[in-house]
Amino acid sequence: MAKCTKKVGGIVSKYRTHHGASLWKMVKEIEISQHTKYTCSFCGKTKMKRRAVKIRHCNSCMKTVAGSAWTYNTTSAVMVKSAIRRLKELKDQ
């Protein structure tokens, strides 16, 4: 019997023949991270979904937040949040 071709690529199979393998491997990481559901920082449920570029919406508590283009949190946003939390703790003491 003849062998079938192996299906690879998944979400980025649309870029397969026109672009190189290194490019679609990078795009695969980006597209997987942008389409995953994230944990909502308000209600704690995994319902935060991408609506548009930089806009995420929680289907549980109906909050809409702005973030990074591909991920929910940017590294600079995480640093700012931790600095604000640290300053609030110092103020309370």
From Swiss-Prot:
Belongs to the eukaryotic ribosomal protein eL43 family. The keyword Magnesium does not apply. Keywords: Metal-binding, Ribonucleoprotein, Ribosomal protein, Zinc, Zinc-finger. GO terms for biological process: translation. It comes from the Eukaryota. This is Putative ribosomal protein eL43-like. SUPFAM superfamilies: Zn-binding ribosomal proteins (SSF57829). One of its GO terms (molecular function) is zinc ion binding. It comes from Homo sapiens. The keyword Cytoplasm does not apply. PANTHER family: 60S RIBOSOMAL PROTEIN L43, RIBOSOMAL PROTEIN EL43-LIKE-RELATED. Gene3D superfamilies: 2.20.25.30. A zinc finger (C4-type) spans 40-61. GO terms for cellular component: cytosolic large ribosomal subunit. Disulfide bonds: none annotated. Pfam families: Ribosomal_L37ae.
